[in-house]
């Protein structure tokens, strides 16, 4: 992929890796210990509501930019890319590595991407290669901290926990 060739970026260029995640409001047993022969009771939630989050991660600064939407589509992709541009005013080029989801190739996104004032440049990772996208590891850490072995009685509490992770825990535990 192109990102291996980007070691010589100018100081006013940056690279981010982007992807979507859809955490579901349900109990996710991941690991635990209890005496042999005993059964473990696990609280469960009713329903399967979920959040739809599209994020972008800068591996140099660990800056995490994200948007939430009713669903992830070309509109939420554009919102996230616009937020990247707003949050990085000093950058002349923002290289964004994405997977090959249909909304990244959407016709309605192309005119916006092609406009001369755009500083975002999309780079597509190979198909079926999530292991090449470092943000996938962040999703795993989020699940370890927030969803695995946790129960949230309400969807609002679940939503708070997810956003607290991104807004508070992530910047505090993994500082610049």
Residue ranges and their predicted role:
Residues 12-15, 135-176:
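C-terminal anion-handling pockets and recognition modules
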Residues 10, 59, 91, 115-119:
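Short, well-ordered coil/turn elements that cap or connect secondary structure elements
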Residues 1-82:
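Extended, low-complexity cationic-aromatic segments
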Residues 19, 81, 92-105, 128, ...:
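Acidic/histidine-rich, metal-coordinating catalytic segments
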Residues 40-46, 114-134, 150-151:
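RNase H-like polynucleotidyl transferase catalytic core
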Residues 106-116:
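Short, aromatic/basic amphipathic alpha-helical patches
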């Amino acid at each position: 992929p192109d990102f291996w060739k980007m070691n010589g970026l100018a100081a006013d260029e940056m690279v981010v890796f982007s992807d979507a995640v859809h955490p579901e409001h349900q109990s996710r047993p991941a690991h635990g210990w209890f005496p042999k022969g005993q059964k473990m009771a696990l609280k469960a939630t009713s329903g399967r509501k979920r959040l739809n989050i599209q994020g972008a991660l800068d591996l140099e600064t660990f800056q995490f930019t994200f948007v939430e939407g009713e669903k992830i589509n070309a509109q939420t992709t554009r919102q996230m890319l616009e937020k990247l541009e707003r949050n990085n005013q000093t950058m002349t080029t923002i290289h964004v590595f994405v997977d090959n989801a249909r909304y990244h190739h959407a016709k309605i996104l192309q005119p916006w991407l092609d406009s001369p004032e755009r500083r975002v440049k999309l780079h597509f990772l190979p198909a079926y290669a999530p292991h090449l996208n470092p943000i996938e590891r962040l999703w795993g850490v989020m699940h370890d901290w927030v969803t695995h072995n946790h129960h949230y009685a309400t969807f609002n509490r679940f939503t708070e926990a997810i956003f607290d992770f991104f807004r508070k825990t992530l910047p505090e535990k993994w500082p610049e």
